[in-house]
UniProtKB/Swiss-Prot annotation:
It holds the Pfam family UDG. PANTHER family: URACIL-DNA GLYCOSYLASE. This is Uracil-DNA glycosylase. It is found in: Cytoplasm. Belongs to the uracil-DNA glycosylase (UDG) superfamily. UNG family. The active site is at D65 (proton acceptor). It catalyses: Hydrolyzes single-stranded DNA or mismatched double-stranded DNA and polynucleotides, releasing free uracil. GO terms for cellular component: cytoplasm. Keywords: Cytoplasm, DNA damage, DNA repair, Hydrolase.
Amino acid sequence: MKNIYKISWLDFFLIEKKKEYFLYLLNKIKNIRRNTIVYPKKNMVFNAFLFTPLSSIKVVILGQDPYHSAGQAHGLSFSVPKGVFLPPSLKNIFIELKNNFSFYKKNIHGCLESWAKQGVFLLNSILTVSKGIPNSHKNLGWEIFTDQVIKFISDICKGVVFLLWGNISQKKYYLIDSKKHFILRSTHPSPLSCYKGFFGCNHFFKTNVLLQNQKKKPINWFLDLFE
């Protein structure tokens, strides 16, 4: 078995940066930025990897592509910086979270950095987007990259809880070794689908049960979320 403490994201990037698709992807995004506003900012694109070291991953929450309005995307799926208005999907995530733990408090902000620092890897399937155009960077190569990320986590880590919300995320299940990890699925927290399975899925509570059963420290989902 591989020693997770001797393997890091650096090892992963050293592998991927040699691949033709990745070189093409980075060059393509660079060219798009010359004529178009792209989110998140260049220095935030890989924030998920900076906030959550490979060896600390307990949970993976897989999103789709970044928010496409100004000031929202900052490299963590579903998250927005402090002070930014909560997008609808994030509002619904917090509704479900509060219902999981019968907890309520006003003035909650949308920055999920505290989750990331506790081992919740907040990954989008596509890591960039052009301003105002959702899914505009689909099929540029990000899907190949993030599929490799998921495979790498599945191979190197053990006992990770994968939260797959929505059809796009659920299609990634085949990348995960279900014999050594846990997969929880539901509809997307978007207003279009939240009542079709996301509300009431109890994923936050179930995740902590699965972590505790492995003698891992549960996630404090409310840590540093209040303004």
